[in-house]
Every structure is written in structure tokens, then in C-alpha cells.
């Protein structure tokens, strides 16, 4: 995926910032007004590309909840491109704190050269500028890369727009047909990876992002873990261990993976060496231990266990030692997922009302709370919310959300994203019902 070449574009000096860095861990703040101006182009075809690039950049920034793209109908200045300084007063007049100018040109190699500059209209200074050289079919990725650069410059955190989501697509009609699908983080470029002839579950990205792993009941005998190469389309069986019900999660170095395997009435966490295929049992005793997830440094594993009667969350060293319970609230905990930043753990929590009805919740808690500290925070609830996963910058959580069947209308499942703060919940549009999302690392 190394098809995008960067060059720093510095046309004017940049010495200061009028805008304060956005703290995305705080509560809701007013989005920063930004104008994404029309991109200049050298041909009518590239004029269309430039228009589409502007749409993608604007949509990325809007979806983040941290920016307010101003409608082009409000623009006063008609000057475009990157050769001259903008008329900053005209942009301040429409309350644009930030301005993006850019251009699209075709190189002799056939590639596109997409350039942009981000301006601070208050200090009248360039904040960042770059040139990207990309194959014509990767213009959308270039737009995501530009949005990533803008997001990073203003928030101080890496962007997450040039990423992929792998998930389980479900037909709305009965019987449901499930297929593994792949899409851009915003729902674009949806592609089916399996044909729907067998039950598939829990797709996971390998560390390389060029491969995925998933569970399939293709033989109807037992669950098998499959590996699929996204470049070649080839797939193979990774393991044929009896008792597997979820795909593994991989260590940060990509050499090992953890999974749960049911044997003799108990379910335990095992680590597998991907080179030798050797298994090492990490938990013991009776009960059900599932949903392991590595810490970003690979030294710890979080998982859920009902060893004390009710499913709770536990952390242990990656060799199975030093087990410590970290959840103490009422309800049942499941599906822990460690933030890529290492600071938080996301989870699903099931609580019951006085009438016995269930409520599903997505929450976060500190990975390393102080003694007796209750760091748990619920960020969304519903009839069915589950399977949380993190954006690569650890500031957005994606999850599956379901609704019940009513009066001959079948229930539905969709994928949503929400900020770490619990604000800006939004649906990720998919062609069919969707569940079990997994977020990739930022693409190369």
C-alpha cells in the first residue's frame, strides 16, 4: 500500500498559531469553523477529482465532530490554488478560522500531484503544506491523508481517516446470510471478502493490515480460523483447534496471538506462536475466560472471566502471571479492547433494570487506575451495543448497535462510531446490516 509519496510544501513562513490546540479528551467543544476551498486543476477531469477531494476532506473533518466545514455558498473570495496568499479578511468575514487551499495536476508519469496548504486566517500564517503524488485511482486515499494532516496539526493527535474497517455484513432477510466485508472507515469502497455460504464471525486485522483472520464454520464440524491475504485474495486455514469461537488478537510485534479455547467444560486463554503454531495456556481453574486483548506494548493482556460468578474484567502479564481484577461495577462485563495509546480499555457491560430488562452499554475505564479509583465511564447505551474497537489514535470507538424485531419487521444491526468523550455518535453507512467491526492501523 506504499503508493503515496509526500513532499513538504512550505510557501510562506509559519511562526505562530492563533488557534489553540483542541483537547479531544475534554467535554464537548464548539467545532472549529474551516473553509475547504475549491482545488485548482489543470484539466476538466482533474477538476472533477479536485471537487471530490474537497468533499472527502470536508466529510472527514465534519465526522470527527471537531470541525465545522463552511458551505462554499458562503465563500466571498473566488481566488483558488496555492500560488498566492489568500485574502484573509474575506475568510474571517465568514467566520472561517482555518482555510484549506489546494490543486490537482497530472504528472508525466500518469500520477496525480495533489497539493494543499492549511492557513490560519487570524494570524494569516501557513500551518502546514504538503504535496502528495498518487496513482489516479488513489485520489480518495490522498484526500483522507490531507484530512489526517489537518486533524493532527490542530488536535496534536494523529489522524485516523486513511484506515479500513473489516466487519460482518448481514442480510436483512431471514435466514440471515453473513459475509466478511471490508470498507473505508467512512463506509466507502465496500467490498465482500467471503461468499456467504458459511457462518463467519469476528474478523481481525493482522498487524500488516494486508491480511485478515476470521472464524468460519465452513465444515459444520467445528470452527476454523482462516487467514485471507487482501492483496492476492488467497486464504488458508490457520488452525483447527477444537473449541475456538472467536478469531485471535495479535501481539504488537505480530509474532503471537491470543484466543480462547473451550475444553472439558472450561474456556481458557491461550497464546499461539504464529511461527511454530505452539500453544501456551495462560489461565487456569474453572470457569469461562474469553475475549483477550493485548496492551500496546504487548506486556499485558486484558480479558473477561466469570471465575467469581459474574463476568468481570481482568489484566494479567502476557505470560499469565500477576492476575488483577479491574472492574467492580454492577452488571456483566465483556469484549474488552485495549486502546492503542494504552490509557483506556473499552468494554461492553450488561445491566438489568428492576423489571429484569437488559440494557447493553459501551464504556471505558483506565487501564491502570489508582487504588480504589472508579474510572469507569459509560459512553453509550441501547437495546444491543457491543463489540467496541478503537481508532488507531485511541480517540474514537466503533461498535455494533442493534434494534429488536417488531410486528413482522425484523431487527437490524448497524455500525456506529462515538468519541471517547461520549459525544458525536454517528452511524457508518453500510449496504446491509453490520456487526463485529475491527479498525485497521493507518495505511502506509
UniProtKB/Swiss-Prot annotation:
Cited function: Part of the Tol-Pal system, which plays a role in outer membrane invagination during cell division and is important for maintaining outer membrane integrity.
Annotated protein name in UniProt: Tol-Pal system protein TolB
Family stated for the protein in its record: Belongs to the TolB family.
Signal peptide: 1-18
NCBIfam families linked to this entry: propeller_TolB
Quaternary structure and interacting proteins, as annotated: The Tol-Pal system is composed of five core proteins: the inner membrane proteins TolA, TolQ and TolR, the periplasmic protein TolB and the outer membrane protein Pal. They form a network linking the inner and outer membranes and the peptidoglycan layer.
Main location: periplasm
Record organism: Rickettsia canadensis (strain McKiel)
Amino acid at each position: 500500500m506504499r503508493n503515496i509519496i509526500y513532499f513538504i510544501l512550505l510557501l510562506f513562513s509559519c511562526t505562530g498559531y492563533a488557534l489553540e490546540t483542541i483537547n479531544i479528551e475534554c467535554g464537548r467543544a464548539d467545532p472549529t469553523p474551516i473553509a475547504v476551498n475549491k482545488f485548482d486543476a489543470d484539466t476538466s477531469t482533474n477538476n472533477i477529482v479536485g471537487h471530490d477531494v474537497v468533499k472527502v476532506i470536508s466529510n472527514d473533518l465534519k465526522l470527527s465532530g471537531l470541525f465545522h466545514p463552511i458551505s462554499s455558498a458562503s465563500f466571498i473570495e473566488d481566488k483558488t490554488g496555492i500560488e498566492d496568499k489568500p485574502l484573509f479578511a474575506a475568510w474571517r468575514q465568514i467566520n472561517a478560522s482555518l482555510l484549506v487551499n489546494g490543486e490537482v495536476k497530472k504528472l508525466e508519469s500518469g500520477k496525480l500531484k495533489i497539493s494543499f496548504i492549511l492557513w490560519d486566517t487570524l494570524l494569516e500564517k501557513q500551518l502546514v503544506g504538503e504535496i502528495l503524488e498518487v496513482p489516479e485511482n488513489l485520489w480518495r486515499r490522498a484526500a483522507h491523508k490531507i484530512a489526517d494532516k489537518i486533524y493532527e496539526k490542530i488536535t496534536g493527535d494523529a489522524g485516523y481517516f486513511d484506515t479500513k474497517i473489516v466487519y460482518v455484513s448481514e442480510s436483512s432477510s431471514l435466514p440471515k446470510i453473513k459475509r466478511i466485508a471490508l470498507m473505508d472507515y467512512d463506509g466507502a469502497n465496500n467490498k465482500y471478502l467471503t461468499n456467504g455460504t458459511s457462518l463467519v464471525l469476528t474478523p481481525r486485522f493482522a498487524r500488516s493490515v494486508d491480511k485478515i483472520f476470521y472464524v468460519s464454520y465452513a465444515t459444520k464440524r467445528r470452527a476454523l480460523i482462516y487467514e485471507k491475504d487482501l492483496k492476492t485474495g488467497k486464504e488458508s486455514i490457520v488452525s483447527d483447534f477444537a473449541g475456538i469461537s472467536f478469531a485471535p488478537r495479535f501481539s504488537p510485534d505480530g509474532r503471537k496471538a491470543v484466543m480462547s479455547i473451550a475444553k472439558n467444560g472450561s474456556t481458557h486463554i491461550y497464546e499461539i506462536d504464529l511461527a511454530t503454531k505452539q500453544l501456551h495456556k495462560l489461565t487456569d481453574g474453572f470457569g469461562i475466560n474469553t475475549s483477550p486483548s493485548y496492551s500496546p506494548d504487548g506486556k499485558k493482556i486484558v480479558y473477561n472471566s466469570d471465575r467469581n460468578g459474574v463476568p468481570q474484567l481482568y489484566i494479567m502479564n502476557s505470560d499469565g502471571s500477576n492476575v488483577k481484577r479491574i472492574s467492580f461495577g454492577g452488571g456483566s462485563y465483556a469484549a474488552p479492547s485495549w486502546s492503542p495509546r494504552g490509557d483506556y480499555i473499552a468494554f461492553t457491560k450488561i445491566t438489568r433494570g428492576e423489571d429484569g430488562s437488559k440494557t447493553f452499554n459501551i464504556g471505558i475505564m483506565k487501564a491502570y487506575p489508582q487504588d480504589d479509583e472508579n474510572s469507569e465511564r459509560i459512553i453509550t447505551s441501547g437495546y444491543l451495543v457491543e463489540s467496541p474497537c478503537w481508532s488507531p489514535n485511541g480517540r474514537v470507538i466503533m461498535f455494533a448497535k442493534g434494534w429488536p424485531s417488531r410486528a413482522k419487521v425484523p431487527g437490524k444491526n448497524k455500525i456506529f462510531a462515538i468519541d471517547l468523550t461520549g459525544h458525536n455518535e454517528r452511524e457508518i453507512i453500510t449496504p446491509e446490516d453490520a456487526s463485529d467491526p475491527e479498525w485497521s492501523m493507518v495505511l502506509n
